[in-house]
């Protein structure tokens, strides 16, 4: 959290999942919502909601930072899909142990295999 009248960090929420690193990797992680939410693949839905489609959104970001992410995008995507799959696997572990905080945790975390497969497909397609 940033202070109300001070641009300094005053608190960190969910420290367990915090990372400091490549801002382009962070942006790609943020863009996983387009992969995870089928509605965001629908251009008409996005337009109606005032949400840019993924290609336009990435273009806006890359133009703002003056960096071309074309070659790195699939690498960032594979990394972040594996990262999210790992997080979901941790949730499934808490479900198994009876310590999951949310009643729908098992359902929410059920995409581990799908995310891992998507990540591995990107690796095989681009890097092997």
Regions picked out by a protein language model, each given a short descriptive name:
Residues 24-65, 79-97:
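Active-site activation/catalytic loop segments of kinase-like enzymes and analogous catalytic loops
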Residues 3-10, 40, 65-69, 105, ...:
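Conserved NTP-binding catalytic cores of kinases and kinase-like/nucleotidyltransferase enzymes
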Residues 68-80:
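All-alpha amphipathic helical-bundle segments outside canonical DNA-binding/catalytic cores
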Residues 9-12, 53-69, 114-115, 119:
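Short amphipathic alpha-helical segments and their helix-coil junctions
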Residues 94-128:
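Regulatory N- and C-terminal appendages and interdomain linkers associated
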Residues 1-25, 29-31:
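Active-site acidic catalytic loop and adjacent metal/ATP-binding pocket
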Residues 43-44, 70-72, 98-105:
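Short, surface-exposed loop/turn segments at secondary-structure junctions
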């Amino acid at each position: 959290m940033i202070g109300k009248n001070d641009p300094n960090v005053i608190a960190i929420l969910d420290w367990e999942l915090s990372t400091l690193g490549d801002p382009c990797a962070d942006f790609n992680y943020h863009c996983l919502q387009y992969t995870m939410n089928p509605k965001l693949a629908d251009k008409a839905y996005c337009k109606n909601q005032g949400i840019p489609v993924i290609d336009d959104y990435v273009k806006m970001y890359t133009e703002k930072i003056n960096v071309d992410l074309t070659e790195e995008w699939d690498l960032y995507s594979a990394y972040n899909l594996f990262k999210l799959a790992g997080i979901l696997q941790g949730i499934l572990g808490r479900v198994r142990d009876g310590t999951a905080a949310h009643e729908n945790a098992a359902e929410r975390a059920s995409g581990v295999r799908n995310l891992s497969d998507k990540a591995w497909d990107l690796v095989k397609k681009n890097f092997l």
